[in-house]
Amino acid sequence: MQISVKTTNEVKVLAFEGKLDTGTSPNAQQQLTRLIEAGENRFLVNFEKLDYISSSGLRVLLAAAKQLKGIDGELRICSLNEVVGEVFDISGFTTIFKVFGSESEALDGF
């Protein structure tokens, strides 16, 4: 899995590519934690190129959201494909996170 990071309008945009599972979740967690500890508190996670997410990947998102809640931050998600979108629907994550169809839509009004 690869994660690219860019900043758009003071929002850290993380684009995930590949699979977010048991093997790759620790790296994703470390990257998010490092950014949060550096003072970042607004994140957009773009899953356009994410092929698969496991329960370990979902836990990474929950942990980051919990950290951000304590510092008045926010984590938004965009560009879910059909497979990842189904996991979000079944797990109820679409009610936990703000999910947007595109990156530009998610950044609007952040």
Specify the residue positions occupied by each region the protein language model found.
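Short acidic-hydrophobic, aromatic-tinged amphipathic segments that line or gate anion-handling sites
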Residues: 98-102
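Short beta-strand/loop segment at the start of cytosolic alpha/beta domains
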Residues: 1-15
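Residues at or immediately preceding the N-termini of alpha-helices
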Residues: 25, 103-104
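Amphipathic alpha-helical interaction surfaces in cytosolic regulatory modules
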Residues: 22-96
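Acidic phosphotransfer microenvironment of two-component signaling modules
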Residues: 82, 104-105
